[in-house]
Amino acid sequence: LFTLSQGGRRIRCRESLTDLTSAVTMTLCQDKRLTHRTLSRAGLSLPAQRLAGSAEDNAAFLAEHGSLVVKPVDGEQGQGVAVDLRTPADVQAAIERARPFDERVLLESYHEGFDLRIVVIGFEVVAAAIRRPAEILGDGRHTIGELIDAQSRRRQAATGGESRIPKDAETLRTLHAAGYDYDSVLPQGKRMAVRKTANLHTGGILEDCLLY
């Protein structure tokens, strides 16, 4: 928590939220089914979405869309989120990893593109950033695991401890998809994303794009 003040006015904040945000608005943002419904009613183009069901139903949804996103209905900071899942086994494993955050798990069709974070205050866009997944740069000597640890320390130092790259199942899945593991040595000068998601808390990088 922190406080912004100007003159005699003070507003309490948590990350990008303020005490001006209503409880109803928080609910609409926190529950991703309600978020989807609200944006759909506003006429926006959205990914297909459904609750995870039986393994057969989940596999059929995957076959229909080719690649999926799995996420808990209620959550934040990218916890329990996995993207670009292409096999039934990966989908089911991601569902199990999401359940500790919420028993209700969503499946969505996956679409490539920019990951944007936009801050709106008083119906005015005041900040915008492209979020990029955590990445490492090979030096031909250190293993990918060592490079991740080093980059994670740099991200923690730059963000006051908020950002680090977890060496978890999602990071390992990303490495395996590229043909690597933690013990592999990345060629010198080769840059590689080690996460599919771009959340700040999992090592993601923010690039200001308000003036683009």
Language-model features, listed with the residues they occupy:
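Active-site nucleotide/adenylate-binding loops and adjacent lid/helix of ATP-dependent enzymes
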Residues: 5-173
